[in-house]
Amino acid sequence: MPRYIFITGGVVSSLGKGLASAAIGALLQARGYKVRLRKLDPYLNVDPGTMSPYQHGECYVTDDGAEADLDLGHYERFTGVPASQADNITTGRIYSRIIERERRGDYLGATVQVIPHVTDQIKQFVLSDAGDVDFVLCEIGGTVGDIEGLPFFEAIRQLGQELGEGNAVFLHVTLLPFIKVAGEMKTKPTQHSVKELRSIGIQPDILLCRCEIPIPPGDKRKIGLFCNVKESAVIEGRDAASLYDVPLEYHSQGLDTEILRCFGIDDAPAPDLSRWQGISETIANPDGEVTIGVVGKYVGLLDAYKSLIEALAHGGIANGVKVKLKWLDSEQFEKDDPFEPLEDVHGVLVPGGFGERGVEGKIAAARFARERKVPFFGICYGMQMAVLEAARNLAGVTDAVSTEFSDTGESVIGLLTEWTRGNEVETRKVGDDMGGTMRLGAYPAVLKDGSKVREIYGQAHIEERHRHRYEVNVGYKDRLEACGLTFSGLSPDGVLPEIVEIEDHPWFIGVQFHPELKSRPFEPHPLFASFIAAALHQSRMV
């Protein structure tokens, strides 16, 4: 049976519980253990698929089509363990299941209540489908004291009791603010956070204290005394220079050792952290720098592009260079000269998005890259905008539009109404529910012989993750190819365009999928590695 680690947070949100969970998973892996990571989100949405990126940040997509919290991206990048539908649960999903069962009569006339029915569903989620692993790490979203989080805290309290001593560890991430005017660190927020946690029946075993400066020994003793934990279990969590330094920093503070001690494991293998040390060294000592202009809609909250940012960093790691990102609001491009802000970049990337806002700015960015021979990477919506640009300015389809934002003109981009998943055909129509109705998850594609993407991937058949409900109309394929836009990747049935490229260009590729979701620091996605290599070449030409 696996052992369970429950990660909670207090004082404020955004303390890095997701990163802490991912780093702990990586440290346990470095000792030879198998891990699984899960996220429990207390919000009432069934999933984050219909939430604004400004509200929630990125919506992460798994191979099996789950629209999930961005923390699952951290989990995958740090551990390499693919996440699934079974690794993210929300209050909305739990209540939906319970109400469905109640309507069927499954509760045999009982009064359906938060305890035991909601808490039992949460416990079932935590314990089910764990697989053959040594540790399951469960992160509870939000902070202790949140009303919506109470059923989750009660469920893990019960699990701690039911699993028994030595099978469950509670780790609480908290804040130790440093008051500059007073010149001292304050422990009261942490004490009150732990007091709140203990009031609902959970005694933390370990405190991961986020702070700006080292914790004085006296404060460590004080925290341990008032929070009822060992002094060695008060772990310092200072900001790291790089995301990928976090496992090394936490190991240096003894976090993984303390976790194993709490489980009664004193004969664990020593960790092999050589891979993490190598990544840290590469990031700290880059051999050059490239600037990538990212023309997006949600640049006001960079968490909306979390996986993209990391995938570009992985491309930099693959080439031994630092990747500097220049964020450009696509809507601003519609008001000002779109070319001027891009003059100093070595590559242009247009990421995914939805809706009409900023469309013409993205199209202008694609035109700049095509005409100036600057490396261009269009992802999902970005590929569609590159196709519209080519249709308008190369193929003469001057009124080319997407039905996503216009009903007039030639629909070069249209609603995706039918596609194949395995041996089944999925269909959608106008008016269907918005949530969970896109083309989601991993789908195969076939690459054209002799194409740039075929060379980049080094194989003819690939599988990538999708999240879209609009698609390039394959009926325009011949007309666009005659003008130089090659359809170099198609679905196996040849119906859905997956990749386009321009042969007479140093590097111009658009993909309908999201390659950033499968990039890892130790295995940079080949498209991002190649894109940064092209940008590096461009930087040495100017």
Curated annotation (Swiss-Prot):
Q: Which processes are annotated in GO (biological process)? A: 'de novo' CTP biosynthetic process; pyrimidine nucleobase biosynthetic process
- Under Enzyme Commission nomenclature, its number is 6.3.4.2
Q: Which residues form the active site?
A: 380, 514, 516
Give the catalytic activity.
UTP + L-glutamine + ATP + H2O = CTP + L-glutamate + ADP + phosphate + 2 H(+); L-glutamine + H2O = L-glutamate + NH4(+); UTP + NH4(+) + ATP = CTP + ADP + phosphate + 2 H(+)
Q: Where are the transmembrane segments?
A: none
GO cellular component entries: cytosol
Activity regulation, per record: Allosterically activated by GTP, when glutamine is the substrate; GTP has no effect on the reaction when ammonia is the substrate. The allosteric effector GTP functions by stabilizing the protein conformation that binds the tetrahedral intermediate(s) formed during glutamine hydrolysis. Inhibited by the product CTP, via allosteric rather than competitive inhibition.
Which residues hold CTP?
13, 146-148, 186-191, 222
Question: Domain named Glutamine amidotransferase type-1: which ranges?
Answer: 298-541
Keywords of this protein's UniProt record, alphabetized? Answer: ATP-binding, Glutamine amidotransferase, Ligase, Magnesium, Metal-binding, Nucleotide-binding, Pyrimidine biosynthesis
Molecular function GO terms recorded:
ATP binding; CTP synthase activity; glutaminase activity; identical protein binding; metal ion binding
Is Chaperone a UniProt keyword of this protein? no
Q: Where does L-glutamine bind?
A: 54, 353, 381-384, 404, 469
The record lists ATP as bound by 14-19, 71, 238-240
The record lists Mg(2+) as bound by 71, 139
Binding annotation for UTP:
13, 186-191, 222
Pathways per UniProt: Pyrimidine metabolism; CTP biosynthesis via de novo pathway; CTP from UDP: step 2/2
Region span, Amidoligase domain: 1-265
Q: Which family does it belong to?
A: Belongs to the CTP synthase family.
Miscellaneous: CTPSs have evolved a hybrid strategy for distinguishing between UTP and CTP. The overlapping regions of the product feedback inhibitory and substrate sites recognize a common feature in both compounds, the triphosphate moiety. To differentiate isosteric substrate and product pyrimidine rings, an additional pocket far from the expected kinase/ligase catalytic site, specifically recognizes the cytosine and ribose portions of the product inhibitor.
Q: Which PANTHER family match?
A: CTP SYNTHASE, CTP SYNTHASE-RELATED
Q: Quaternary structure per UniProt?
A: Homotetramer.
Query: Which function does this protein serve?
Result: Catalyzes the ATP-dependent amination of UTP to CTP with either L-glutamine or ammonia as the source of nitrogen. Regulates intracellular CTP levels through interactions with the four ribonucleotide triphosphates.
Q: Any idea what this protein is called?
A: CTP synthase
Provide the species name: Maricaulis maris (strain MCS10) (Caulobacter maris)
Gene encoding this polypeptide?
A: pyrG
